[in-house]
């Protein structure tokens, strides 16, 4: 607001206005011109940098600094100068919003700067949407008046729901793109005409200065059901093209009927279908003048048919996409240039950008190929957005239109294994994942369908293909050949990019499996991305391999029966019993087991064969070559001994000394690969550092694989061959001090479990001490394999999920409810610290426990007690009267007045501070000021009454609003809503006041107390007796203290601060008693107002 002036009359008139008149006019003009800036988003538009903030109560997070390099800033500066010049000369201001055709008014076309605005061609071609008139009028007088911010809100609402905003929202910022804003004097001769009779809206008239008010009106074009087709004065001959389009539609209709007989399952595209596409070279900006140009290249938005179809956005196919990252700029710009090399309009439409096309040609294949390439490029951009930004794209620096030798539609894309030595040793054909092209490409016709049937012949890549599979009239056209070749190059590059884009994709260098199917299956059957899962598989006979619960089978060569170990497992998404989520952990060296161990590949066997439990062993790049050769020797030995089931079983039995074979599979949770080792005798895998597993109660020492402290995630899996169903136990928390438990027997673990149960039954108010997290237990699910896994008594494994909760409560029990590091729960009571005030429970000592977690050094007084007295631990306390431990005795506490006055006047040192409270302050009366959201500093104190919780005190500082404070009406209602850190309402204070008699330069205060009074059913009593009982039994629940002052002109302000008292004890706690809340408002009486200092 303006500063107060010396003159009393001028001060009375000028003090109220929040804006200068010129600044307010500029804000309105910028809101009209920048309030609908197009952008590529769901909303489709945004407010520019120079628009006034929507909520003046909250300051903007980042203040925009104008730069001459930005066209939007230059245009805003020009608009500001024009508006201020017209306003100072007392000339009404006119802002016109219009659309221009896209054909001749693009970035390469004529600009609209300077004299071009007066060009008759522009006036003829432009479509006027809105005409705003900002006119100064004499000052409005009367009791009912409008503030400036009210007009701003009304104009913002109109702009938000305007026709232009609706078009931008439907098209996600694509159309319209050539938007022109013209600021000029509101002269009748300068006004452009509407194409239809406009509708007029007049806004409320606020006073903007001591003698001038502002009248704002807008005339707008009626709502259009369809987007208008704008044509310039040059390209208006459309009748010829309509005739040609009708002939094409008839021709395509006959072709579509023939295509159904040809068996093409893909939907037929009509060449006359509209397709609007936006090139993502940058943010879509509004073109107000030629300097404020958009950063994209304008494309033709004419439909490719002239059948009278509208440019309705609901019927149009609008595809907007952005560049994925800066690293993809080169390839993206090349794709954009390739896309721009051919116009989106049909080859028969002659304009300045497509004049090289012959208007006499009628070739539907060109239109379909153009549309297909358009969709391919759009899907490439979508895929690049979702691609891993850290992955180096293969297509970077390689344009899509480069000619390369590649198959048109490969059925399966091969890759190479990272470890080629394993591939050479493996004699079995490895399954090849089919690349999922759903996010990258979608093609129609026989060539575009990627079938998984090996018997399906490939189409001739040189033969042009149309929608019905018949040769068209344009076979010999070189444009068709170039388009087909370009499409094949795009497909090949998509495949290469997909292989390298996913860092988890395995590289297969071998013959792909022949996929046998009873029905045609598209390429979207399964994906070979191993992002989150590596699945354990079981082996069947060497002659056939089948995936469980899959609709296809992978047939391998019967002549090669040896098993191989792929470096990266094939992971079809199975929902069977073998699903396990195994995460990759980098830089972990894997030590392979000896060849004598039964480490085997895991696949499914057929139902008529005896099932074996095998596991895949995967090597990482950090493994040395000795380990790889050792693995290969082991695999060969395992393959040669594959039939000898009895020998393997006997060997395992010798180690386990039991009738049934029990295997330990301790799997490090890797992100991509798993290291699954099978331990069958003691001391075999002592180099592998993993968690300890205890097998049987009678077995004192089993195979132990130690894990270092740096390993955070290990997974324990126990598989039982008799039941043939593995029971998997996972450990997801950090392992600490595993070595302490290596030499403890089964009885010690039983004693530990008993101690845990005893501690768990302890009093809930006792603060948890530093218990060893290994001493807790966890119930195991009772399943088929759980009987044999009961012997796993190691509490490190059994209490895996609860380890993070049993640490010190200061680190783990404090949960963040709002995503910050704010402490939320109390260790003793378990109650939320940041919710609505709730008292702490009493302990057995009978004293009010001090919450040491809320103590802060800046608020902690040396006199404040910091510990509680425990009667049971203090032998001298039994013979003495017990005093309050939460506050000193009343005799030693020198209070000036009662507790309420001492707290409100800051005579007591706070015991602690609770951060995160906020309050919304508002007022209503003859006018409604802006509601302000302000922080509240909340503290609590020590009290003298035993076990009585201290009320909270909150202080709302108003100094941030200015030296005068928060302006309120002379009389009305003040509303203060208090929120806790969880944004839950604690209390809503409503205070009714009347300060119309308050003179200027005076001050006063109001205090409202809210008491909880017991409800009395007996009404027959004297008034004096009732008042005396109420004063004795009523409890103060809430209090608000308001300070008021008046300025020299008599305006009323809330100044300095607002002080609150609210109880920590919620009313719901005393739900058993019948209480009601009663409020009393008090103010000074003699004198009621005092002069300002």
Curated annotation (Swiss-Prot):
What are the record's GO terms for cellular component?
A: nucleus
Question: Cystine bridges: which residues?
Answer: none
Q: Where is this region: Required for macropage invasion?
A: 895-952
What residue spans carry the region label Transactivation domain 1 (TAD1)?
29-37
Instruction: Give the start-end ranges of region Disordered.
Output: 396-479, 558-579, 746-788
Residue ranges, annotated region (Transactivation domain 2 (TAD2))? 979-987
Q: Which UniProt keywords apply?
A: Nucleus
* Compartment(s) where it occurs, according to its Swiss-Prot or TrEMBL record: Nucleus
- Name a Pfam family for this protein: DUF4210
Q: Where is the composition biased (Basic and acidic residues)?
A: 746-763
Origin: domain of life? Eukaryota
Q: What does this protein do?
A: Transcription regulator that syncronizes transcriptional and translational programs to promote macrophage invasion of tissues.
The record's annotation in PANTHER family points to: ATOS HOMOLOG PROTEIN A, GH03947P
Notes on the domains: The protein contains 2 transactivation domains (TAD). Each of these domains may be required for transcriptional activation of a subset of target genes.
Family per similarity comment: Belongs to the ATOS family.
Give the protein name, as stated in the record: Atos homolog protein A
- Tell me which species this is from: Gallus gallus
Name the gene for this chain: ATOSA
């Amino acid at each position: 607001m303006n500063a107060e002036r010396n003159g009393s009359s001028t001060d009375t008139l000028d003090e109220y206005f929040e804006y200068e008149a010129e600044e307010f006019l500029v804000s309105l003009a910028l809101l009209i011109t920048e309030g609908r800036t197009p952008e590529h988003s769901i909303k489709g538009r945004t407010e520019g940098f120079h628009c006034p903030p929507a909520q003046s109560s909250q300051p903007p997070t980042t203040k925009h600094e104008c730069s001459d390099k930005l066209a939007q800033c230059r245009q805003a500066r020009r608009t500001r100068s024009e508006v201020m010049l017209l306003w100072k000369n007392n000339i009404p201001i006119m802002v016109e919003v219009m659309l221009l055709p896209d054909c001749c008014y693009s970035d390469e076309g004529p600009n609209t700067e300077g004299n071009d605005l007066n060009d008759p061609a522009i006036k003829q071609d432009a479509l006027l949407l809105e005409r705003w008139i900002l006119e100064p009028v004499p000052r409005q007088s009367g009791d009912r008046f409008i503030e400036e911010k009210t007009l701003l809100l009304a104009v913002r609402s109109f702009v938000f729901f305007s026709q232009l905003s609706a078009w931008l929202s439907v098209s996600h910022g694509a159309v319209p793109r050539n938007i022109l804003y013209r600021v000029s004097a509101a002269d009748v001769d300068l006004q452009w005409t509407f194409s239809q009779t406009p509708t007029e809206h007049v806004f409320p008239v606020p006073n903007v200065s001591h003698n001038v008010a502002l009248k704002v009106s807008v005339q707008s074009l009626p709502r259009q059901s369809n987007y208008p087709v704008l044509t310039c004065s040059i390209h208006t001959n459309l009748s010829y093209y309509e005739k040609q389009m009708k002939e094409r539609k008839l021709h395509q209709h006959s072709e579509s009927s023939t295509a159904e007989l040809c068996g093409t399952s893909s939907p037929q595209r009509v060449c006359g279908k509209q397709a609007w596409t936006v090139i993502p070279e940058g943010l879509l900006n509004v073109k107000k003048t030629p300097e404020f140009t958009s950063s994209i290249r304008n494309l033709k938005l004419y439909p490719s048919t002239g059948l009278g179809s509208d440019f309705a956005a609901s019927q149009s196919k609008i595809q907007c996409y952005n560049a994925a990252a800066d690293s993809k700029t080169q390839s993206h710009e090349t794709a954009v240039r390739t896309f721009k090399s051919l116009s989106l309009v049909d080859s028969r439409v002659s304009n300045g950008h497509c004049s090289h096309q012959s208007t006499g040609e009628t070739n539907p294949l060109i239109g379909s190929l153009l549309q297909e390439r358009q969709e391919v490029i759009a899907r490439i951009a979508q895929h690049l957005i979702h691609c891993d930004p850290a992955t180096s794209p293969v297509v970077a620096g390689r344009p899509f239109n480069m000619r390369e030798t590649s198959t048109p539609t490969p059925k399966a894309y091969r890759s190479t294994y990272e470890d080629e030595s394993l591939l050479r040793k493996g004699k079995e054909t490895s399954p090849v994942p089919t690349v999922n092209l759903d996010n990258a490409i979608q093609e129609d016709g026989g060539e575009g369908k990627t079938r998984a049937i090996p018997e399906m012949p490939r189409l001739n890549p040189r033969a042009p293909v149309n929608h019905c599979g018949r040769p068209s009239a344009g076979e010999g056209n070189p444009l068709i050949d170039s388009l087909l070749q370009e499409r094949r190059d795009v497909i090949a590059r998509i495949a290469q990019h997909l292989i390298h884009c996913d860092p988890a994709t395995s590289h297969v260098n071998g013959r792909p499996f022949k996929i046998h199917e009873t029905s045609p299956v598209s390429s979207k059957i399964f994906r070979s991305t191993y992002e989150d899962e590596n699945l354990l598989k079981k082996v069947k006979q060497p002659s056939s391999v089948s995936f469980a619960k899959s609709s296809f089978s992978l047939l391998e060569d019967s002549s090669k029966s040896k098993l191989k170990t792929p470096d990266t497992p094939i992971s079809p998404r199975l929902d069977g019993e073998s699903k396990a989520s195994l995460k990759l952990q980098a830089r972990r060296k894997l030590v392979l087991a000896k060849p004598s161990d039964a480490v085997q590949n895991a696949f499914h066997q057929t139902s008529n064969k005896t099932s074996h439990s095998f596991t895949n062993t995967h090597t990482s790049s950090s493994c040395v070559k000795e380990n790889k050769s050792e693995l290969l020797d082991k695999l060969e030995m395992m393959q040669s001994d594959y039939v000898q089931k009895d020998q393997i079983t006997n060997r395992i039995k010798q180690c386990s000394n039991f009738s049934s074979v029990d295997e330990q599979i301790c799997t490090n949770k890797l992100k991509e690969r798993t290291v699954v080792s099978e331990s069958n005798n003691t001391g075999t895998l002592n180099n592998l550092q993993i968690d300890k597993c205890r097998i049987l109660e009678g077995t004192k020492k089993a195979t132990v694989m130690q894990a270092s402290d740096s390993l955070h995630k290990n997974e324990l899996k126990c598989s039982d061959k008799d039941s043939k169903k593995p029971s998997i136990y996972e450990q997801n928390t950090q392992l600490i001090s595993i070595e302490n438990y290596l030499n403890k027997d089964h009885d010690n673990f039983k004693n530990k479990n008993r101690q845990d149960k005893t501690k768990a039954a302890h009093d809930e108010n006792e603060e948890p001490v530093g218990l060893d997290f290994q001493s807790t237990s966890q119930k195991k699910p009772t399943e088929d394999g759980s009987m044999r896994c009961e012997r796993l008594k190691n509490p490190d494994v059994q209490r895996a999920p609860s380890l993070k909760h049993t640490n010190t409560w200061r680190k783990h029990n404090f949960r963040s409810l709002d995503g910050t590091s704010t402490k939320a729960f109390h260790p003793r009571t378990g109650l939320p610290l940041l919710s609505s005030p709730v008292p702490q429970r009493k302990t057995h000592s009978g004293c009010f426990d001090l919450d040491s977690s809320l103590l802060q050094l800046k608020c902690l007084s040396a006199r404040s007690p910091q510990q509680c007295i425990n009667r049971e631990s203090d032998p001298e306390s039994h013979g003495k009267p017990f005093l309050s431990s939460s506050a000193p005795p009343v005799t030693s506490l020198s209070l000036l007045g009662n507790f309420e006055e001492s707290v409100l006047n800051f005579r007591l040192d706070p015991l602690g501070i609770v951060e995160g409270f906020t309050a919304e302050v508002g007022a209503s009366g003859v006018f409604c000021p802006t509601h302000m959201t302000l922080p509240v500093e909340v503290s609590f104190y020590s009290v003298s009454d035993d076990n009585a919780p201290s009320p909270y005190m909150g202080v709302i500082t108003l100094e941030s609003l200015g030296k005068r404070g928060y302006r309120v009406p002379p009389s009305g209602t003040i509303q203060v809503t208090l929120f806790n850190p969880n944004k839950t309402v604690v209390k809503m204070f409503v205070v009714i006041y009347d300060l119309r008699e308050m003179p200027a330069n005076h001050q006063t205060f109001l205090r409202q107390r809210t008491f909880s009074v017991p409800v009395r059913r007996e009404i027959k009593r004297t008034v004096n007796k009732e008042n005396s009982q109420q004063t004795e039994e009523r409890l103060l629940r809430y209090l608000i203290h308001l300070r008021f002052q008046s300025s020299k002109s008599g305006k009323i302000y809330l100044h300095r601060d607002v002080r609150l008292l609210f109880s920590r004890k919620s009313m719901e706690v005393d739900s058993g008693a019948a209480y009601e809340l009663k409020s009393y408002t008090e103010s000074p009486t003699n004198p009621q107002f005092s002069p300002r200092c």
